């Protein structure tokens, strides 16, 4: 392949996301994709910074700029959403609403800082969230990657509230929100790609918070599997039965 293509199969180039994807024992990486970390940090915990923690915590700290006393809703209780909840606690939020379609996932959200939990399929969920938050949350983080989740996140914010889209759906998916409410109630809607993070700046910061016991990244670590069992991990993820599965040598 001339030595200039990093990933290939049978002579064909393999395209991948963010320049870092590599399910392999060894990989050649761009220097721009590397961040030096404290060697005392367990690699199975540091690995979680690559997406889940950086995306979720970054959406709270960088994109939405949660401050002390803000009420926060997180729609989607996967790895990104749980990371957002931990970051909301660290930022000083005293009321954190967890929303998901899975009661099983909602049960574990309190371990990550949620003070209230609601099933997204509840037809009265918007009124229930607003009743708990004096008219709606200050900030809602969508971390499910589906349009309905973003619409719900927008609906549970208060007048002047901010909705942050951290999930990534298919490029063809669209959302429907009230143009009138967006303008008349001075709400805002903002995107957050990878937590608006600069890895060289934010990964060390988040790892310091982990070492201080502020971001319990270790709570996100699920099963550890071998590389040859990778497909089983994907199957588990599709079923919604995994937090963050870690590949180990």
Question: Could you say what each language-model-derived stretch is?
Answer:
Residues 1-34:
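Glycine-rich phosphate/adenylate-binding loop and adjacent beta-alpha elements
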Residues 32-33, 38-123, 127:
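Mid-domain Rossmann-like dinucleotide-binding core that forms the NAD(H)/NADP(H) cofactor-binding site
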Residues 66, 133, 144, 155-158:
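A generic alpha-to-beta junction signature in SAM-dependent methyltransferases
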Residues 85, 106, 150-154, 179:
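Generic hydrophobic/aromatic pocket-lining and core-packing "Φ" positions
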Residues 102, 169, 195:
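Residues in the short beta-alpha loop(s) of Rossmann-like NAD(P)-binding domains
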Residues 123, 147, 151-155, 200-249:
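C-terminal hydrophobic helical "lid"/dimerization subdomain
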Residues 124, 128-140:
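A short acidic, Gly/Pro-enriched loop at the edge of an enzyme's catalytic core
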Residues 161-164, 176-219, 243:
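Rossmann-fold dehydrogenase core element
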